Each structure stands twice: as structure tokens, then as C-alpha cells.
């Protein structure tokens, strides 16, 4: 059952526990979970071709051994395998490849594989962020399928392009402009159309980096002639 279905059934306590229950963990309890998850990943990574390109036959059994055996690495240490997208060398089967620029690197871009389990974790994380962004106290939040979200994101294959897809698996929030249209527009075009639509449809959410928020504020200023808008 996804977030939309639980909201419809008014299962608010269950929603909070599923997505935000981690806030009740003690620091020791939280770190115990993180250590267990890290050691699961170490085992997977150690047994794949990518991991062995660094480990050279070693197999760390726990986090302490991993720290002793594995040197600090950079993207360049994995680039030959990742840039050629060799799934047989990875610990899991990628369902999508994300990319970003590689400043000063030997190739114009960097790519990173995302498995289904990684996407599931990403989906849960962005849903938790959505809930917490509207929360004033434990268990209290204000999220609905009728909410509107400004699409001020870089589309796929950039990582932020996963955001509307992941959220769409949980709830039918409307993006302004619609994702299918936004991905074919420039950043400036998306912002201008999104703000024009928001003036008519009641914008509820915005997600972006600080630099993006600044660029968006400039777009808003140009649309309002520098007068700004009244926020309720």
C-alpha cells in the first residue's frame, strides 16, 4: 500500500511510523542499523568485479577490516568500469544510470548505476522529506494528492530527475509544469511556465539546491517586475 492509499484510508499513524519512525531511534540504535547495512554492502561489493578491482583478492568480513584493507578512492579509480557501463562487474543489476559532470576529470561526465533497491530507498527518503517539510510536531503533517509541486529540477539522466518518478510511485502530486512536458524544456522555460501555472493553481512545494533556489527567485522577480508576491 503506497502513501496515496494510506492517506485515503486516513492511516496517519502508520504513515508516520513507516516513513519517519527512524526519528524515534536512539543514536546507538541508529548507528547499529547503519553498521549492519554497511556490512551488507561491503559483502556485496567485495564479491563483485568492481570491488575486486580495488581489493585485489582480499575479502573484508566487517567494517573494521574494510577500513584497514581499502584505501581512499576517487571516481577515477572506478571510471573504466562505470563509464563503459559493465553490469556484470557490479554487485547488483542497474535499472537506470545517472550522470553528472566531471569537473577536471578525464571524461566530460560521470555515471552511476542505480539498482531497484537503491530506487526504493530513494523513494522512501524523498517521501519522508515531503512529510517532514509539512510537519509541525511528531505525527502531524499536511500532504495530499491534490498538492502542487514546482518542477525546478534537472531531468534524467541527472539525479534530480528521479525525484518526480520516485514520488509518483507513492502519491499523485501534480508537478508544474507536467513532467512529460518539463523534460523537453530548458531550465528557464520550465521555471517561467511553472510560476505562471503556480499563480493560477496554488503552489504547495518546491525542491532544489540553494543555487537553484536563487535562480528560481530571479525568475520569479522577472515575472513580477521586481515587486515580489504575497505569501500566505
Language-model segment annotations:
Residues 1-99, 103-232:
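Nucleotide 5′-phosphate-binding alpha/beta core
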